[in-house]
UniProtKB/Swiss-Prot annotation:
SUPFAM superfamilies: Bacterial exopeptidase dimerisation domain, Zn-dependent exopeptidases. Its EC number is 3.5.1.87. Disulfide bonds: none annotated. Residues 208-325 are annotated as: Involved in dimerization. Homodimer. A divalent metal cation 2 binds at residues 90, 125, 380. This is N-carbamoyl-L-amino acid amidohydrolase. Changing residue 261 to A: Loss of activity. A divalent metal cation 1 binds at residues 79, 90, 189. Requires divalent metal cations for activity. Binds 2 divalent metal cations per subunit. Its cofactor is Mn(2+); Ni(2+); Co(2+); Fe(2+). It comes from the Bacteria.
Length: 409
């Protein structure tokens, strides 16, 4: 029923907003590029017959009324902001597919018991202020006050950026939804991995979203001359760091479900001919089960301490962030499964290793996600790509999922 060509044209048009010479997209929160994106999507929402407004957090919302004005609302959406030099599907697909769903309903005279709201959440990525999911946290009523003091590379705080965008940070609590007012939240998103591609399927149903911990390691040794210091006398924190990173890989692999990554490492003083004095790196550890993730972390910590003693270096750790795993709602999963069956797609289940706005909304409503196949599993890159056909398939599954949720009492 949905018009895949219309969805695709909108994706491509939106992808021009913030486009870089590399072909990637940079569209940070509370910038002129984000404003242009919001205005463009707002025009799509109005074309779809929605009542359009922004809440106190800057979340862009388009509402389709239901037959019962007192019924709880079904939310569908994602985000419009990007990472630096990212792709044009991560976030926008979920928002524009939501618009396509309600526009198709309106064009075919489909009415629902529950109202439906399409939401484009503010600052999911956190690329500008290094604190993400601002809009969804605000809607859930869980945005900590200290987040307003986070600053970008230019020294501008989140509070200042909101004011520059015409928002009042003091009104942020007004964005919070009251308990019991949201029936469910459904998000269509690119997978950002290779599982669907490996299985040859265009869409999949998400079982849950992995919980993560970020742990900063600081390893201190002794800076000495690289040529004049015998190997037997060295207190080399870089060698210890390398050994610990291998331990992380080994312990994560033992479970079959945990993933551990070190994507950031700093070496001091950083001379070619100097044994480092200090090495810092951050561990990203994720699993769908918190107890499994925590067991892996304990094993890593014990082995890291052993390595420190063997190499005569000092290891300290600091937990930077923790996010609990979130399981998707049985009701939303059943609706998505029925949608797949209706459309002739297998019900393929997979977890999400990446965090999404869904995580923040889980405390206030049932949540669910549908994934669309990612070419080569690439995301957060100009090479991010999903085909027109796969995007349309995901939107069709989303349509029938939302319809079923919005029809029920």
């Amino acid at each position: 029923m949905i018009q895949g060509e219309r969805l695709w044209q909108r994706l491509m048009e939106l992808g021009e907003v913030g486009k870089q010479p590399s072909g990637g997209v940079t569209r940070l929160s509370f910038t002129a590029e984000e404003r242009r994106a919001k205005d463009l999507v707002a025009s799509y929402m109005r074309e779809a017959g929605l009542f359009v407004y922004e809440d106190a957090a800057g979340n862009l919302i388009g509402r389709k009324e239901g037959t019962n004005p007192d019924a709880t609302v079904v939310l569908v959406g994602s985000h419009l902001d990007s990472v630096y030099n990212g792709g044009c599907f991560d976030g926008p697909l979920g928002v524009l597919a939501g618009v396509e769903v309600v526009q198709t309903m309106n064009e075919h005279g489909v009415v629902t018991h529950h109202p439906i709201e399409v939401v484009a959440f503010t600052d999911e990525e956190g690329a500008r202020f290094r604190f993400g999911m601002i809009g969804s946290r605000a809607m859930a009523g869980t945005l900590p006050p200290e987040a307003l003091e986070c600053r970008d590379a230019e020294g501008i705080s989140l509070a200042e950026a909101m004011k520059q965008a015409g928002l009042d940070p003091d009104r942020l609590p007004q964005a919070a939804r009251k308990p019991g007012t949201v029936k469910a939240y459904v998000e269509l998103h690119i997978e950002q991995g290779r599982v669907l591609e490996e299985t040859g399927l265009p869409v999949g149903i998400v079982t849950g979203i992995a919980g993560l911990i970020w742990v900063k390691f600081t390893i201190e040794g002794k800076a000495e001359h690289a040529g004049a210091t015998p190997m037997s006398l060295r207190r080399d924190p870089m060698a210890a760091a390398a050994q610990i990173i291998i331990v992380i890989e080994e312990e994560a692999r033992r479970t079959g479900t945990t993933v551990g990554t070190v994507g950031q490492l700093h070496v001091y003083p950083g001379g070619i001919n100097v044994i480092p004095e200090r090495v810092e790196f951050v561990l990203d550890l994720r699993d769908l089960k918190a107890e499994v993730r925590d067991q892996v972390w304990k094993a890593i910590a014990v082995r890291a301490e052993t390595i420190a003693k063997e190499r005569n270096v000092r290891v300290t750790t600091e937990r930077l962030q923790e996010m609990p795993p979130v399981l998707c709602s049985d009701e939303v999963k059943r609706a998505a499964e029925a949608a797949c069956q209706k459309l002739g797609y297998p019900s393929f289940w997979l977890p999400s290793g990446a965090a999404h706005d869904s995580v923040q909304l889980a405390p206030i409503c049932p949540i669910g996600m549908i994934f669309v196949r990612s070419q080569d599993g690439v995301s957060h890159s100009p090479a991010e790509w999903s085909t027109k056909e796969d995007c349309a398939a995901g939107a069709e599954v989303l349509y029938h999922t939302v319809w079923q949720l919005a029809q029920g009492e």
